[in-house]
UniProtKB/Swiss-Prot annotation:
Annotated GO biological process: cell redox homeostasis
Similarity section: Belongs to the bacilliredoxin family.
InterPro entries associated with the record: BrxB/BrxA (IPR009474)
Organism from which the protein derives: Staphylococcus epidermidis (strain ATCC 12228 / FDA PCI 1200)
Protein name: Bacilliredoxin SE_1195
Amino acid sequence: MDLNFDLYMNDVVEQARNEIEHAGYQQLTSAEDVDQVLQQKGTSLVMVNSVCGCAGGIARPAAAHALHYDKLPQRLVTVFAGQDKEATQQAREYFEGYAPSSPSFALIKDGKITEMIERHQIEGHDVMDVINQLQALFDKYCEER
């Protein structure tokens, strides 16, 4: 049996994109998209998506389920590390003081990083731990919606 790795990876990437988009996150695929959203006043949660196991098993489910909460960011967006390289690099310009990390979450307020949940805070944790971390950020920086 000959498995075409590129086709397989394309399917994995497409599934990962669809999963986070279905949860309500807007895909940012260019540097211009990133600047247009993150320079706005208010709060934006950026999910740095990836194809690693902890993204699919922990980060994306947490990104979806954390939204069942009273306080939420005004905007939910995602960039895809390793896929949308220009958008991901531009988003990381906003993550001042943090090393590149995927999957990860960054809460941006008025164009500036407030806090980040990095890969080491996701990998090896369960979904509920990450949901709690996200909702703690929402409590601290967001308003009821």
